[in-house]
């Protein structure tokens, strides 16, 4: 038997476009428990990698990227951080309109990580670009390729 909470989450994912148009969508999300901390009831399913209420595979598993898009549209950085930590795809992060701030520790970790994917690299560069002063941005417009732009961004942030 499905609980009321499970039914509400399933409805939210299925009808997220209509719910986001509703003027009281923030209260709806709060009532459904989507403003959570790291100890929230939602767990990553071990079998399919989606979000599950129990951590076990079932037909009610929810795509983590649907929750990520919803959190980004609501500009809730805490949920975005949690979902990315749980394995959500970072390619949607540019929807945050450069409001995501990376800490010094996160930047240092990225600098020393040779395994970072191209998708993650582009998302990070997009975030960093939003934090640069105007003079550096004007100089970066001279870059002809995305690789050159990414290189300039990383040099600007990781130079000693």
UniProtKB/Swiss-Prot annotation:
Sequence similarity: Belongs to the asfivirus MGF 300 family.
| Function as written in the Swiss-Prot or TrEMBL entry | Plays a role in virus cell tropism, and may be required for efficient virus replication in macrophages.
Which protein are we looking at?
Protein MGF 300-2R
Origin organism of this chain?
African swine fever virus (isolate Tick/Malawi/Lil 20-1/1983)
Q: What is the lineage of its organism?
A: Viruses, Varidnaviria, Bamfordvirae, Nucleocytoviricota, Pokkesviricetes
């Amino acid at each position: 038997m499905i609980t009321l909470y499970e039914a509400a989450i399933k409805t939210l994912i299925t009808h997220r476009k209509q719910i986001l148009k509703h003027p009281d969508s923030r209260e709806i999300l709060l009532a459904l428990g989507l403003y959570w901390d790291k100890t929230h009831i939602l767990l990553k399913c071990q079998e399919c990698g989606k979000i599950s209420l129990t951590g076990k595979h079932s037909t009610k598993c929810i795509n983590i990227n649907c929750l990520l898009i919803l959190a980004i549209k609501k500009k809730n950085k805490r949920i975005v951080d949690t979902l990315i930590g749980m394995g959500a795809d970072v390619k949607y992060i540019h929807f945050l309109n450069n409001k995501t701030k990376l800490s010094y520790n996160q930047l240092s970790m990225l600098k020393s990580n040779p395994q970072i994917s191209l998708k993650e690299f582009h998302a990070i560069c997009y975030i960093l670009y939003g934090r640069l002063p105007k003079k550096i941005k004007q100089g970066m417009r001279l870059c002809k390729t995305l690789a050159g732009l990414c290189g300039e961004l990383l040099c600007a942030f990781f130079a000693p």
